Design a protein with these regions (language model features):
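Flexible, small-/acidic-enriched active-site or ligand-binding loops
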Residues: 2, 332-376
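Conserved small-residue-rich beta-alpha loop and adjacent elements
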Residues: 6-45
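A short, aliphatic-rich alpha-helical micro-motif
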Residues: 9, 75-79, 127
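A structured beta-alpha segment of the ubiquitous adenosine-cofactor-binding alpha/beta core
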Residues: 15, 54-106
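Active-site-adjacent "lid/gating" segments in soluble enzymes
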Residues: 29, 33, 94-244
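Glycine-rich phosphate-binding loop and adjoining beta1-alpha1-beta2 segment
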Residues: 32-64
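Aromatic-enriched alpha-helical interface/lid elements that frame and gate functional surfaces
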Residues: 227-302, 306
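A glycine-rich dinucleotide-binding beta-alpha-beta segment and adjacent secondary-structure elements
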Residues: 300-350
């Protein structure tokens, strides 16, 4: 592990009010890039912290936000912070005395990042929900799946992480840049339903251009096209095919032996949408003539755009990912390495995930509290040292 003192965000101080999912992941991304992240956990928080790699690179303070002493400690941290991240329902942080107004009163340069599903305003703002609900309203869920079958979510990647965490990080970094010009912080209202909707921008454009149909599973990217599909092989495992461009499709046809013996003008021409079902049936039969690994050996290093569908364990052993170090082992835990990769100030995993409250004394002292004051807070139950 590295201290990552030279990461691109070295010196940026982040306070994360502990929650689940997107906000902690956003804080992890900032920590990977060198930010000094202090996670404020609940005093009763426990569990398998060592395995929760979303908390890597962070220090942990355990504080009861409903107790005046716990809240006041967080406000002391806010005075010295550049960023605060929270993922509560709208109004909760305000009721705790830790909303944007209270925090900006202590630090006018603070970037206040808010992660919610529905956003801070709107009829659903205070309604419970999860990734699947947010992508349902965005239209992203409707488009995911096969023809005449139910929509299928891609885990909780689209709403929580792509539409949530990534947009929160982007907003925070943009606001930090703006602070350098204005000297004033601001609130970043990152709603997963907004982010997921932005992710559908290209498909919105394609619909407007008349080249994307309303029916699921009938278009190029939604498994309608035979050259952009997942196919079962002879051993029951799968290959992913993405031969979109004509030259890549021609390579796929040539190397795989598809329609061998047919005239070139028939064999190498990408089929029109009306012919997709018939061509897909032929491809399905062909893919079942070899195992996944046999197809990978034949096509994986060509421009046919074919790769094996790997499970969680297999991905760790793929030669390309091994050479790039896409997964690393830190403190005995295998996990994805920081991304993206910067040439001069790369990201790094600077510390293992903390036990809740592991750094309470250390962080409180850095905030200016003396030993007696820290002891009093611990004795009152407002904070906890693990």
């Amino acid at each position: 592990m590295s201290t990552n003192a030279t990461g691109p965000l070295a010196g940026v101080r982040v306070v994360e009010l502990a929650g689940l999912g997107p906000a902690p992941f956003a804080a992890m991304l900032l920590a990977d890039l060198g930010a000094q992240v202090v996670r404020v956990d609940r005093p009763a928080g426990a569990g398998a912290a060592r395995q929760d790699v979303v908390n890597r690179g962070k220090r942990s303070v355990a504080a009861d936000l409903k107790a005046p002493g716990g809240r006041d400690l967080v406000l002391e941290l806010v005075e010295r912070a550049d960023v605060l991240l929270e993922g509560f329902r709208p109004g909760v942080a305000e009721r705790l005395g830790l909303g944007p107004a209270a925090c900006s009163e202590r630090n006018r340069r603070l970037v206040y990042g808010r992660m919610t599903g529905w956003g801070q305003q709107g009829p659903l703002a205070k309604v419970a929900g999860h990734d699947i609900d947010y992508i349902a309203l965005s239209g992203a869920l409707w488009a995911s799946g096969r023809a005449e079958e139910r929509p299928v979510p891609a885990l909780n990647l689209v709403g929580d992480y792509a539409g949530g965490s990534m947009f929160l990080v982007m907003g925070v970094l943009a606001a930090l840049l703006e602070v350098g010009r204005s000297g004033e912080g601001q609130v970043v209202d990152a709603a997963m339903v907004d982010g997921a909707s932005v992710l559908t921008t290209m498909f919105t454009a394609l619909q407007g251009m008349g080249v994307w149909g309303a029916d699921r599973g009938t278009n190029v990217f939604d498994t309608g096209a035979p050259f952009y599909e997942v196919y079962a092989c002879a051993d029951g495992r799968w290959v992913a095919v993405g031969a979109l461009e004509p030259q890549f499709y021609a390579e796929l046809v040539r190397v795989s032996g598809f329609l061998e013996g047919a005239p070139d003008e028939v064999r190498y021409a990408q089929p029109a949408p009306a012919d997709w079902p018939a061509h897909k049936a032929i491809w399905e039969r062909l893919w079942r003539t070899r195992s996944r690994d046999e197809w990978t050996a034949l096509l994986g290093h060509t421009d046919a755009c074919v790769q094996p569908v790997l499970d969680w364990a297999e991905r760790l052993e793929h030669p390309h990912l091994l050479e790039r170090g896409t997964f690393v082992e830190v403190d005995g835990i295998v996990q994805p390495a920081p991304a993206p990769r910067l040439s001069r100030t790369p990201g790094a995993i600077c510390r293992r995930p903390p036990v809740p409250g592991e750094h309470t004394r250390e962080v409180a002292a850095e905030a200016g509290l003396d030993a007696a004051a820290i002891d009093a807070l611990i004795a009152s139950g407002a904070v906890m040292q693990a």
